[in-house]
């Protein structure tokens, strides 16, 4: 059985990896953290896309037929372009998934007040990805997003558990 690739711009995606390992114990995983270029939140679409595509290709080269983008900014800025423009032409038998849609699917079920606060990078907040996805599944919720430029450094320094 092939390994599932998990990509993040740093260490934050290890929480996604831990959850995947618990839910899918029959699979092996390869984690790729791009700590040298983290954080991605303030970077342009082109930079995030290039870095994410590079990591995805490396995980494909390591034999992963599925790559999970555990990075919110990569999911917000690069996922759709990779899915719609790169995969059909170059890797039609491989898949790349992000974390925003699955999070948006369950967020409405978790709130009793229907008011949700989201702390994220500037790039994730500016993309409106969470608002666009969450309204599809839970149109009754009100999402409050706040860009926190210091969030990723706190996670990377292990001062906050994400």
Where are the predicted features?
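Non-catalytic structural scaffold of enzyme domains
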Residues: 1-162
């Amino acid at each position: 059985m092939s390994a599932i690739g998990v990509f993040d711009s740093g260490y934050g995606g290890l929480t996604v990896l831990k959850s995947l390992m618990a839910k899918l114990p029959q699979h092996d995983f390869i984690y790729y953290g791009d700590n040298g270029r983290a954080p991605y939140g303030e970077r342009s679409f082109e930079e995030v896309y290039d870095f994410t595509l590079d990591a995805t290709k490396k995980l494909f080269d390591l034999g992963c037929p599925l790559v999970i983008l555990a990075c919110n900014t990569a999911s917000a800025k690069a996922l759709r372009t990779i899915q719609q423009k790169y995969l059909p032409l170059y890797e039609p038998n491989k898949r790349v998934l992000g974390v925003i849609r699955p999070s948006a699917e369950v967020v409405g079920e978790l709130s009793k007040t229907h008011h949700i606060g989201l702390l994220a990078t500037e790039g994730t907040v500016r993309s409106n990805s969470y608002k666009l996805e969450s309204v599809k599944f839970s149109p009754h919720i009100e999402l409050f997003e706040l860009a926190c430029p210091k969030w990723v450094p706190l996670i990377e320094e292990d001062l906050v558990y994400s």
